[in-house]
């Protein structure tokens, strides 16, 4: 009888421990301005021009003990590009750049997540301007824990670089402006 009880307790403890290490799904919290997708590019090599995409949605799966189980999916409405300059934004939405009339969305879907020191390398496919290319985002967990509303949250920062010509954006902006740095800060609410 004691052996059956010990076996039952051991199996129960094992199941509880295994369950707590399972990857959790999160919805990116953009409603409360807790997530940002920004970019910067050199302006003629003299200064940085910053912008953002204000309309996007996404989710991620996170297991800090098993990064191979992690996933990231983001959909960006490219019409929401915002550089704090209406005329430039109109130009960026046009055929020479984002061509939002033909390609209203950009997407990122991870294919692999690897632990990299105290952060993660998130490798995936970015589709922009009708072209899909592999991109690596270097990411760090900024924090995780319970929120005051009974939920659980996890936040990350990530950045990576893309070459404009890789995505059929061939407008000549000069030699110092061939790459765009992507800068992401996201907070996700665990899906129950």
Swiss-Prot record:
Keywords: Periplasm, Signal. This is UPF0312 protein YPO2315/YP_2102. The lineage of its organism: Bacteria, Pseudomonadati, Pseudomonadota, Gammaproteobacteria, Enterobacterales. GO terms for cellular component: extracellular space; periplasmic space. It is found in: Periplasm. Its main location: periplasm. It comes from Yersinia pestis. Transmembrane segments: none annotated. Pfam families: YceI. InterPro entries: Lipid/polyisoprenoid-bd_YceI, TTHA0802/YceI-like_sf, UPF0312/YceI. SUPFAM superfamilies: YceI-like. Residues 1-23 form the signal peptide.
């Amino acid at each position: 009888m004691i052996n059956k009880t010990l076996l039952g307790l051991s199996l129960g403890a094992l199941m509880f421990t295994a369950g707590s290490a399972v990857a959790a799904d999160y919805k990116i919290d953009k409603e409360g301005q807790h997530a940002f997708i920004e970019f910067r590019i050199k302006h003629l090599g003299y200064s940085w021009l910053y912008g953002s995409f204000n309309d996007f949605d996404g989710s991620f799966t996170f297991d800090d003990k098993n990064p191979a189980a992690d996933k990231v999916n983001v959909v960006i409405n490219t019409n929401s590009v915002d550089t704090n300059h209406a005329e430039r934004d109109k130009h960026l939405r046009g055929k020479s750049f984002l061509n939002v009339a033909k390609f209203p969305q950009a997407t990122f879907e991870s294919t692999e997540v690897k632990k990299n020191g105290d952060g993660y390398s998130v490798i995936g496919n970015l589709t922009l301007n009708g072209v899909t290319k592999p991109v690596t985002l270097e990411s760090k967990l900024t924090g995780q824990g319970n929120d005051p509303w009974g939920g659980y949250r996890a936040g990350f920062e990530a950045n990576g670089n893309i070459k404009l010509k890789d995505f059929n954006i061939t407008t000549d902006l000069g030699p110092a402006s061939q790459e765009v740095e992507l800068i992401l800060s996201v907070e996700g609410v665990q899906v129950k």
